[in-house]
Amino acid sequence: MSIEKPEVDFPGGEPPADLAIKDIWEGDGPVAQAGQTVSVHYVGVAFSTGEEFDASWNRGTPLQFQLGAGQVISGWDQGVQGMKVGGRRELIIPAHLAYGDRGAGGGKIAPGETLIFVCDLVAV
């Protein structure tokens, strides 16, 4: 199955206070668990503006990281766990589980910004 870069649906309204996880579709491969190295394709969008700030798809290479080891923002460490390879999941990550009051990306992510990611688990 060939997957393509997803469009991110902008929910509007008030951002959630806690991590919101929604499976867009569930994969049928191995389950991602803490301590494993995972490979994730993603699109990231700012909740307040709907503007895309980053996407691994644009680089053609998924992001590899050790799950649960603090190599990525907390919302990812929590939100990717339990995904199955081949699955796509939407994560809405409040600032305290993302970049907090410091923002990131050279101004692309504002301080206190809630983030929306659509993540595809490519491999574990």
UniProtKB/Swiss-Prot annotation:
Means of activity regulation: Inhibited by FK506, ascomycin and rapamycin.
Lineage top rank: taxon: Bacteria
Pfam families noted in UniProt: FKBP_C (PF00254)
Alphabetical keyword list: Isomerase, Rotamase
E.C. designation(s): 5.2.1.8
UniProt domain PPIase FKBP-type: residue ranges: 35-124
GO MF entries: peptidyl-prolyl cis-trans isomerase activity
Catalytic function, reaction form: [protein]-peptidylproline (omega=180) = [protein]-peptidylproline (omega=0)
Protein name: FK506-binding protein
Species of the source: Streptomyces anulatus
